[in-house]
């Protein structure tokens, strides 16, 4: 009897790695934009931090998006997330350009970045599961490590992108934003189109195959994941970590300036 051959998912895996890179890039770019926005839009420190408020406020939609994913599937959520990211960046390009010279330009910028953030939330729901299923199970840990490494590389590249493409020795003005954001929007839509036309496995496939065993073992587990104390401790730890990850790069430049 011949062994079942694992399909070659190299190309889809590369695309998903690009998505992981994009998640880290956009998230760090958002933090790196705060000092630029404060000067370009003439903001106070409090107003500048609205960039983070609007972006990370989108994560409250993670549970509704997870429910949506269970209905439309992983691939549709992945494509939709990239499409929303692309629309958000392009809307930022069009909206900021249209609102230049008005008091509403910063509000338009924030609203469009919140759209981008909604897309990023969708991508974070599905990226890691796809990394795990796009290849042999025994190399899943390696793929996951590589995807997180790319995410970390993106956090280094994003500030360089901001300084060389958006700032680049030019005056810090709102009109410097639309061009680069249009490029990012088009790039996200191109990746979405590629993923739409390629075949991807369902990360829930193994779960469905093992449903019988899961039912048999159900009595070993509590009725809800929230009944496990370490889930709450884990959530608290992540919240504290995010406060450090976001707070330090967002606040430190202002601290350096005043000191």
Report the location of each language-model feature.
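Extracytoplasmic
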Residues: 11-43, 128, 158, 248-256
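Juxtamembrane intracellular "pre-TM" segments in multi-pass secondary transporters
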Residues: 1-10, 205-234
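C-terminal ends and interior cores of transmembrane alpha-helices
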Residues: 83-103
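Central cavity-lining transmembrane alpha-helices of secondary-active solute carriers
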Residues: 50-70
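Extracytoplasmic gate region of multi-pass secondary transporters
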Residues: 30-34, 158-159, 223-259
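Helix-loop-helix hairpin linking two adjacent transmembrane segments in secondary transporters
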Residues: 137-138, 143-203
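Hydrophobic core of transmembrane alpha-helices in multi-pass small-molecule transporters
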Residues: 102-123
């Amino acid at each position: 009897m011949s062994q079942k051959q694992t399909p070659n998912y190299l190309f889809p895996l590369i695309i998903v790695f690009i998505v992981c890179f994009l998640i880290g890039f956009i998230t760090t770019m958002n933090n790196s934009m705060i000092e630029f926005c404060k000067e370009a839009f003439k903001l106070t420190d409090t107003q500048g931090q609205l960039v983070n408020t609007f972006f990370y406020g989108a994560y409250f939609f993670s549970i509704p998006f997870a429910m949506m994913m269970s209905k439309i599937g992983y691939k549709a959520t992945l494509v939709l997330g990239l499409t929303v990211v692309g629309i958000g960046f392009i809307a930022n390009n069009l909206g900021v350009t249209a609102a230049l010279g008005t008091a509403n330009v910063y509000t338009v910028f924030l609203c469009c970045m919140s759209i981008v953030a909604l897309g990023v939330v969708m991508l974070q729901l599905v990226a890691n599961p796809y990394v795990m299923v796009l290849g042999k199970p025994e190399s899943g840990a390696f793929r996951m490590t590589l995807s997180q490494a790319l995410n970390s590389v993106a956090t280094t590249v994003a500030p360089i992108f901001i300084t060389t493409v958006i700032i680049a020795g030019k005056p810090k003005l709102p009109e410097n934003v639309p061009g680069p954001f249009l490029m990012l929007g088009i790039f996200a839509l191109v990746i979405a189109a590629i993923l739409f036309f390629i075949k991807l496995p369902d990360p829930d496939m193994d779960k469905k195959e093992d449903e019988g065993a899961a039912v048999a073992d159900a009595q070993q587990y509590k009725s809800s994941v929230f009944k496990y104390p370490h889930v709450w401790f884990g959530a608290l730890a992540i919240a504290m970590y995010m406060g450090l990850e976001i707070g330090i790069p967002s606040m430190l430049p202002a601290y350096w300036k005043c000191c």
